[in-house]
Design a protein with these regions (language model features):
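Alpha/beta-hydrolase-fold enzymes
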Residues: 94-179
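Acidic catalytic loop of the alpha/beta-hydrolase fold
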Residues: 212-216, 248
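Active-site glycine-rich loops that stabilize anionic/oxyanionic intermediates
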Residues: 22-25, 211
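Catalytic nucleophile-loop/oxyanion-hole region of alpha/beta-hydrolase
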Residues: 24-27, 53-82, 86, 258
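Catalytic active-site module of serine/aspartate enzymes centered on a nucleophile-bearing elbow/loop
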Residues: 231-269
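Short beta-strand/loop motif that positions the catalytic acidic residue
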Residues: 201, 207-209, 213
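Short alpha-helix in the alpha/beta-hydrolase fold that links the catalytic acid
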Residues: 203, 217-227
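Conserved alpha/beta-hydrolase
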Residues: 34-58
Length: 269
């Protein structure tokens, strides 16, 4: 795991943010966010998940449980090198699931967490009970395609802006094939586990989710927030539904405003 960083050009940063990218992509797709964070006075750390981007491993084929453990370890490394004790987490899609799971495993040393389109319930929605029966096969044949279609098939699924999908398709570091069985199965099971443990959430949390997301189910975010607030009615936990937005809310027309909202939320915490 190769963790990279960008430091704000001030002696004392306002905070430190660890950014976690989604399935099939890489950390370089979050330049707009990291640029804005650095400009606002935040130090930013990021890395490519195993099997993604420039990281080692078979392409997009990984047990998501490993990625969660990697994230917990990355947080320890970030704390050791951070110029401030104010640590924030950001995660998108699968990275949102990983970030939430990491937060639940170790809620210490965190000022707050922001997620966009977290993969608590990846689409199409397959019951966890069914997936558990497939797990032995997934470990035996991890690269077996779980889906017959790629993210490129048909209309844009990432953003209402077709240029976002075109850029993804042209990017040599993104994965365009179907979801490998091991990745898909463990993502669903980890999402189910995170939703089951949502009532343990006490860390300040803000989730953005597009109402027209075709890759991760908005119901997953609603369930997480509902369960967390039911257990802790006074908790600082909120869901903002972005009307009409697809999966990558930061790459929608509302994206610049959402980035400003994220920075404002970090400042408040």
């Amino acid at each position: 795991m190769h963790i990279q960083s960008r430091f704000a050009h001030i002696t004392t940063p306002k905070g430190t943010v660890l950014v976690s990218h989604g399935y099939g992509e890489h950390s370089g797709r979050f330049t707009a966010l990291t640029d804005a964070l650095v400009e606002a006075g935040y130090d930013v750390f990021y890395y490519d998940h195993y099997g993604h981007g420039t990281a080692e491993g078979p392409r997009a084929t990984v047990d998501v449980g490993r990625l969660i453990r990697d994230h917990v370890n990355a947080r320890r490394i970030v704390r050791a090198h951070a110029r401030t004790t104010d640590i924030f987490l950001f995660g998108h899609s699968m990275g949102g699931l990983i970030t939430a799971a990491s937060m639940l495993l170790d809620p210490t040393h965190l000022r707050g967490t922001v997620l966009t389109g977290p993969a608590f319930r990846p689409l199409p929605d397959i019951p966890a009970s069914t997936v558990r029966k497939l797990l032995p096969l997934a470990r035996l044949m991890p690269s077996l395609p779980a889906t017959s279609t790629s993210i490129r098939d048909g209309e844009s699924v990432l953003s209402r802006d077709p240029e976002v999908q075109k850029a993804f398709d042209a990017d040599p570091l993104t994965w365009k094939g179907g979801t490998p069985l091991l990745t898909g199965a463990t993502m669903i099971l980890q999402g189910d586990e995170v939703l089951r443990r949502a009532d343990q959430t006490t860390t300040p949390l803000l989730i953005f989710h597009g109402s027209a997301d075709k890759l991760t189910d908005l119901k997953g975010s609603r369930t997480f927030v509902s369960n967390a607030i039911a257990a802790h009615p006074d908790a600082d936990i909120h869901l903002r539904v972005v009307d009409g937005a697809y999966h990558e809310v930061l790459n929608e027309p509302e994206g610049p405003g959402i980035i400003r909202d994220i920075i404002s939320w970090f400042k408040q915490h």
